[in-house]
Each structure stands twice: as structure tokens, then as C-alpha cells.
Amino acid sequence: PYEFDLNIKKLNSDLEFSFNSEHSFSNDIINTRVFSPNKNILLYGIANHFPASGYLDTYNKKLILMSASGVLAYTNSKLENLKNNLTFNQIKTNIGKFIGEEQFRKSRIHDFDWLEGGWFSIKDINIYKDQIFVSYTREVREDCWNTSLLHGKMNLKLIIFENLFTSDECVHFYDNVDSEFNAHQSGGRIINIDDDTLLFSIGDFRSRFRAQNKDSIFSKILEINKKTNGYRVISMGHRNPQGLFFDAKHNILLEAEHGPEGGDEINLIKLNQQEIPNYGWAISSYGEHYGGKNAAYNKKKYVKYPLHKSHTEYGFIEPFIYFDPSIGISQIIGLNEKNKYVVASMKDESLYFFYYDYDDKNINSPNKVVNGSVDNIDMKRVHIGERIRDMIYYNEKLYLYL
């Protein structure tokens, strides 16, 4: 984990950068620290087998960390008392009942090296009051997968997980319409809205035709009723939704999404609309299929999925911000109630801080990021130098999992 000490009021910073308005991010970053988790947790596979695949949250002022392979742990010290070397205690769970060792070792699938890729793994954790929620890639039947949800009552000694949301719909590795499969494109981000409701993202697993099917759970953001396990579609046409942040002040959901080759997106999703907001995948995108239009193996793909640059011309919603080339976008969070946000990246190994004035009628979509900045929007890139899989904001500090 990596800590940014954010204090909007102080005037001195180690990393100084300025904006062109009173909403400046200069002086926000006061100092940084890097923490090394204790070796016992590392041996269980937090970083050794799944590059930059760990997920963070807080509970009772302590840092909670879950590895991609399902190891759950908490810090001995409270966040305000952290030392440079973190000491984690493992929490016993029954998560092996749902995602045992055999699932992670699915190497028989085209001789895929699970140690290198971590296709089938934990995708996020989220703690709300005394409940913990975990998303993961679930094998519904032999070699057929989706993204599902578990939940349990928080306890630092033992957590018993139960199913919260799953579906019989799954994408088969061998037998699917698009003849492609990629479990990295699984989404899995969780945010709790209130006692009854959470939002949950699911990617397309590279089964592109499902994105425009309203009856499919894939390429969607779902609203899950935690009491009934029922769901409804909040938005659709998403390739791989990696980040979610609910801005309660404006009743807006900010979504960060992996594009294909180019075309990572930040979308502003208005909630509770009569029509399901549709963001265009896999008909419109500011990216290209891997290999581009000139690759012979892509000719049929572009016929079915043309990736038009315009979204509005084809009845879709334009992204608020898009990145071309891609940055390998991950989590997005709000920093305070003053419309300041930060989005993390894996490929670009950077943080992008930005401010958005919801009352500025001159800001239209889409907005392309060029060299870390974008016209009409205050944005600043801060290079970290490591892949950033997850981050949380707690007590004016950013904690990053690298």
C-alpha cells in the first residue's frame, strides 16, 4: 500500500502542481509513504502471483486488504498509527468453499498460466457498516464464468461468506458467439449506496454481443437489493467497468472503464432514469480492436462491432472523458464535497486528479485527455511509477495498492 497525505488547507507540498482556477490541486499532496506488507501475507500470494491485484477498505479505523487469491487480512495498528512496515493479521474465512484452489489453477484452459495472469480471482471488496462484500469470477459450470457477489458479517477472527448475487448466465471459454474469452474483462467493482442497495459492475468477458442485450447481466452496472437479492440494470454498453464512485450530492455515478486499444473512459451516469443509459460498447468506442482495422483477423469483427467514434450519432451516450492511448484505468473516487476526483491507472502508473463544475454549461462530452490534461477541465497527472490496482480515501489520505 501507498499513502498520500492529502490536506486541502495546507500551503506547502513535496509534489507541487497548479491549476488555473480557485479549485486548484496545488498543495493537496503534502507527503507520501510506502508500506511493505509483512512476509507472511506475501507468501499467500498477494503480489507474487497476481501483479497489482489486491483490494483495500477500512474497518474500525484499520486497513483491510484482500489478495486476488482470497487471503483477507487487517493491520495491527489503526490507520493513524501506521509504521513504515505493515503487520497484517490474517482473518479466517470460508471463501475456499466458493473459490477454492482448483479454480485459480485452471491451467488446462489453453494451457493458460494462471500464476501470470490471475484471470480467475477476487475482483473487489467493500465494507459497509458491519458487512463485507466480495466480488469474484465464478465458474458456473465447466469452463463457463461470470462475476458474482458474496457477503458476510465483519469479524476480525472469522468471516462466514454466503452468496448474495449470482446468475446462471455465463461466458464459456470454448463455446461462445465471439470465439474469444478474457476473464480480465470481468468488472466486479462494488459500492454500497445505503442499507438496502449496492451497485455492482460486470464486464463483457470479451463476449461483445451481450453488451447491447438488455436481458444479459454482462457489460452492465447493476443495482442489487441486499435484502431480496433482486437486481435491475442501471446502465449498459460497458466493456470492462473497473471503477465506481457515487456522488450523492449530485446523484451521479462516476464510472471508469477499460477501453480496447485506446478509449478508456470516465462516464457520468445519471441514476433513476426511465430509459437505461447506454454507453455504446461494442458499437461505438474511441478505441480500436487489438491489432487495428488493417489486421486480416479483425475484418469480420469490425463488421459486427464497428467501433464508431461518435456515440451520439448511433443513439448512445458520449463518455465524459476518454483516454487515447489507454492508461489502463482502475478505480475512481471523490476526494471531498467540492467536486474533486481522482482516477488511478495501471498501464500508465499514474493518478489523474480532476475537478468538474457541474454548473458549467460550456463543458460538453466527450473530452479527450492529451498528455495528462484535457481542455475545459482542471486535470493533473501525477506519476507514481507502479501499477495502481485499488485505492481508498480515508481521513484526507489516499491509500493505494501498487
Across the structure, where does each feature detected by a protein language model lie?
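Residue-level detector of Asp-centered blade-edge/turn motifs that repeat once per structural unit
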Residues: 56-60, 127-130, 192-195, 247-250, ...
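Conserved beta-propeller blade signature
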Residues: 62-66, 131-135, 197-201, 252-256, ...
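Short coil/turn segments at the loop-to-beta-strand junctions that recur within blades
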Residues: 89, 167-172, 238-241, 384-388
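Asp-box/WD-like beta-propeller blade repeats and closely related beta-sheet repeat scaffolds
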Residues: 116-120, 143-191
